[in-house]
């Protein structure tokens, strides 16, 4: 299983990155590559096409319905509906919080009675209920954010030994909470947002992690590797790493577009 960072800018596209989007791929025993996209935020669809044909994505998992995590589903709908390649209608499966289908339709501006169903098959996450995608298993975990939000644990075959199972835990957007602890527990890689900064953002809780709180989740969950992401353009990534390093002794990286993590 491997993770490719498509976009990692926090809250809006930055000068060097699209908003949140992460491609997870794994090969099954026959050699077929299965592809899951975690979030498809503002500006991400264009960058995603550097890595994969969007019509070949097996599932898109949305952490929540803020635009920096789902806005480019409107563009994906256009890609699937109007691409001149012909043949049967292209359809991509989407899992997200309750109301995902109506939110996408509203954002696109569908008329009453129109549907995106020929091209986007939308399902609602059920917390704790795994979703199988080839050799991958996705388990949503409810986390703390101002809107309904989920982290996602992705379990799949290790790159160096497919008989061994590994776990990528993606926080989406969250503050410290019991769901975050559940999400991180025993993960090989914790892909954790760190949009806030200790001292600067202390008065605002229930929205985002700091580097320190991401590090605390990694330490508490005995995580193998921490990858910090979702940093807005005005943050200094070095500050997030310094905060996390104060409480977590394992490897720490900062996500960057094109970064590949083999699990």
Segments (PLM) and residue ranges:
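Binuclear metal-dependent hydrolase catalytic cores
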Residues: 1-170, 175, 180-182, 241-263
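Cap/insert and terminal regions of metallo-dependent hydrolase folds
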Residues: 176-261
